């Protein structure tokens, strides 16, 4: 059974260790990548050994976050998961299972978190794990640099659909404003994350529209892609996080 921590207690746990492994979930999205990267750079600022491990490659659209990827170069004192609701979400690749048998810390915003970690910072009302991690990094007295702000904004904006989802609250916008004040490149990030599509994504959309169906007396429109069609378009599955528009 996990023990629930508050923000300050989580910050103290992280400050007490020198070698820290950060775990993201498989098929990584903007929140888990953004949090993993932001925490890595915060720990680096404290002159700690840290690295990020994920079962799957970081999607190209998030390459700018550029965390150090774990290659087994140190023995972790603490394993911390970010935006991971259950052990099953870690995946099997990259030797991840070796480090998921005992997860020390978890920072998450999913109300259904299974409580797999020894200690958990959980707020099911938060729009993204990045919203919680921002508070943790501040509690660690680490400066929110422009790059850390970019990473956290990536998590915050992608998990809220660019602040369109119902999970978005006033506090979400306040956190975003603080990240802007810290130097987050919001205009560039919004263009990259929400307005830029690869040629492969455009091809996938073209194929999907061939399946257009109307239901509920025309009030609902449905499109879809089969696995074979995804392979045919050669689209990166990460590029399909956002719905076709």
Regions found by a protein language model. Name each.
Residues 2-9, 85-86, 137-139:
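Short, motif-level signal for alpha-helix interfacial/capping segments enriched in acidic residues
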Residues 2-61, 70-78, 158-245:
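Hydrophobic helix-and-loop "lid/oligomerization" segment in the mid-to-C-terminal part
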Residues 39-40, 96-99, 122-123, 174:
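Glycine-rich, phosphate-binding/catalytic loops in enzymes
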Residues 48, 102, 142:
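Short glycine/serine/threonine/alanine-rich loop segments
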Residues 52, 104-106, 120-121, 220-222:
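Conserved beta-strand scaffold positions in the cores of enzyme catalytic domains, especially
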Residues 63-119:
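Active-site cofactor/cluster-binding pocket
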Residues 110-175:
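Short alpha-helices
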